[in-house]
Amino acid sequence: MDTVLISGGTSGIGLAAAAVLLERGWNVAISGRHREKGEAALAALSVPDRTWYIQGDVACDDDCRRMVEETVSHFGGLDGLVTSAGVYEQGLLENVTPADMQRLFSINVFGTISLCRYALPHLRRRPGNIVTVSSDAGLQGNIACALYGATKGAVVAFTQSLALEAAPHQIRVNCVCPGDVETPMLEQQLRDHPDTTRDAMKEQYPLYRLARPDEVAKTIAFLLSDDASFITGVALPVDGGLTSW
């Protein structure tokens, strides 16, 4: 039975990916910073013999190493990695602080890199696959998204380069780039910016709606599966046509 580690797996896209992969027969380890959220996620997934929660912060390199090691120790190996942990910060560049820069890059970029670095030796043995989570903001510019877009663009570039490094070992590395998704992160964004409405967000999309977490999750599951066995180095928009405008 295949095993996947999903960072940021206690809510949003990560939790949806955990549910989809469980349905498809995977063992699933999820990580997150808050134990109570992790326990709630395990209860929601309702498959105790095939799920495992690891408390940790992807901004900490030692925690990233431990997440991988605990997954391998508990399930006996690692076949897939999904780096869905991330934070969003909207604001004009002149209002960005050094602390903002450190926080977003530590979580969105360095956390992704660290997890992949520690996972690669284990994935090489299977071989396994990696799916990183970027954003439409990593593919095109957005007002008040210079910092966030920089982190997500870095994830895309990292994914494409790592795919070339890993290909000789038959490890595939791909990236999903969602637009706005109906997640707790989106709800927080709307609370923080009351001048932004859900309807205004929908108007950006040719399909005139926001994504559901399961739609992104199923794309992740596809990229991890043998159905995508000849796909690597791809940054795949899951954005209702937003980046096609």
Question: Model-predicted segments: where are they?
Answer:
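Conserved glycine-rich cofactor-binding loop
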Residues: T10-S11, H34
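Alpha-helical segment proximal to the catalytic Tyr-Lys
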Residues: P121, L164-P168, S229
